[in-house]
């Protein structure tokens, strides 16, 4: 695990899990806890494996007066060769929790790509109790053989702040992963968007309900049984309509998620507050389509949307992951999307979004896909006045796939 920070120091980054060719990849270590004013450290990424990728480490919790950090990305399940189910992607690490009173939670790590099942996205960290937004859940990993990974759940905000967006479900030719659940607002703030379902009939996650006094429900939130809450939502929708029509973003509310499989960009968050929408995943094709960029966060507070994952290239190159959306004044940048797998070359990871000018964590770059020619990891976002820059994404492994005619993949419940 990463070392704990001093009074003003950030916690250390957790070590990365090791590579394994015939067993489970190593688990990434947790990031260190921050000092009193320090941010938590980044979780380490899980190790690659031909059987099952290691899980990413959790982001370290921040000091009492500081910010959380992002969870490590899940390890990539290796190719088991021809006529085989192949490997299972590792789960993304949980985002670190913010300080006691202020600060946003860290984003969950993305689930790893698996030639059998994609890894589950990590849950977003929780914000400080007074002010701050919940961290975004990580995107589920692509599952080429069976099921895409489930998107991570969005974190819980403070009294003032938005619930974290749920991560998008991973794509699959068989069964797409379901989107993650959006975080619920407390007093003032929007509920987080439910993550979009992955290509392959994945279902959208349930959106979070807004704060008690002011805020808009997240995408795919359940219908309210309270007449007062329903009236509040109807009034806000009427107020938002001219802003949305004239400027392309609401006054209060989250941006819309990009449609899965189109590479559409996520919408921008509200002029006052709101999270950016998640970018849509890229299309599967001869060459995979690029993932959409995450939408920008709201002006006063709001988290940038997570970039969409690049599409799978069936005979060519994988698509590049979309860039994470930038925050403006107070909020965390979105994580970049993972590059898509391709037969000849993996896609590059998307760049992480920039942190807010005053408070918030910078987004982590997306991981490059592993294939004959591994993709390049995305660049981490720029930090704000009181935040470090985001970590760069890991590059994909390169090399020809082997042949293993009788190999069978273990089921997820046999992984221990």
Please describe what each predicted stretch is.
Residues 97, 107, 126, 131-139, ...:
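Glycine- and aspartate-rich repeat motifs characteristic of hemolysin/RTX-like Ca2+-binding segments
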Residues 7-9, 20, 36-38, 49-52, ...:
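Glycine-/alanine-rich, low-charge beta-solenoid repeats
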Residues 81, 104, 119, 129-186:
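Ordered, small/hydrophobic-rich secondary-structure cores
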């Amino acid at each position: 695990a990463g070392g704990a920070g001093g009074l003003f120091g950030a916690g250390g980054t957790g070590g990365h899990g090791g590579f394994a060719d015939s067993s489970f990849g190593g688990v990434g270590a947790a990031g260190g806890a921050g000092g009193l004013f320090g941010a938590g450290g980044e979780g380490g990424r899980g190790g690659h494996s031909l059987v099952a990728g290691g899980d990413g480490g959790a982001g370290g919790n921040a000091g009492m007066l500081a910010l959380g950090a992002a969870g490590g990305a899940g390890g990539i399940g290796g190719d088991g060769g021809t006529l085989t189910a192949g490997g299972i992607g590792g789960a993304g690490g949980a985002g670190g929790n913010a300080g006691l009173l202020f600060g946003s939670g860290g984003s969950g790590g993305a689930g790893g790509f698996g030639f059998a099942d994609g890894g589950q996205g990590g849950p977003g960290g929780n914000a400080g109790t007074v002010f701050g937004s919940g961290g975004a859940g990580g995107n589920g990993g692509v599952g080429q053989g069976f099921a895409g990974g489930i998107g991570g759940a969005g974190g819980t905000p403070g009294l003032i702040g938005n619930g974290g967006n749920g991560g998008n479900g991973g794509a699959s030719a068989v069964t797409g992963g379901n989107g993650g659940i959006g975080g619920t607002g407390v007093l003032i703030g929007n509920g987080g968007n439910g993550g979009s379902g992955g290509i392959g009939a994945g279902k959208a996650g349930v959106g979070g309900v807004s704060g008690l006094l002011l805020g808009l429900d997240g995408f795919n939130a359940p219908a309210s049984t309270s007449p007062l809450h329903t009236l509040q939502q109807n009034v806000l929708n009427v107020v938002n309509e001219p802003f949305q029509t004239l400027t392309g973003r609401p006054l209060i509310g989250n941006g819309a998620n990009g449609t899965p499989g189109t590479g559409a960009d996520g919408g921008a968050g509200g002029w006052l507050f709101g999270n950016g929408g998640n970018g849509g995943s890229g299309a599967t094709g001869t060459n995979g389509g690029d993932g959409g960029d995450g939408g920008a966060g709201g002006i006063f507070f709001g988290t940038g949307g997570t970039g969409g994952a690049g599409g799978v290239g069936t005979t060519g190159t994988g698509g590049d992951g979309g860039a994470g959306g930038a925050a403006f004044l107070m909020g965390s940048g979105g994580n970049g999307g993972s590059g898509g797998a391709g037969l000849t070359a993996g896609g590059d990871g998307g760049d992480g979004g920039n942190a807010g000018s005053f408070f918030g964590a910078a987004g982590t770059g997306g991981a490059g896909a592993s294939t004959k020619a591994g993709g390049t990891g995305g660049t981490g976002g720029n930090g704000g006045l009181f935040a470090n820059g985001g970590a760069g994404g890991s590059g994909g492994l390169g090399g020809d796939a082997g042949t293993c005619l009788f190999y069978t993949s273990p089921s997820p419940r046999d992984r221990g």
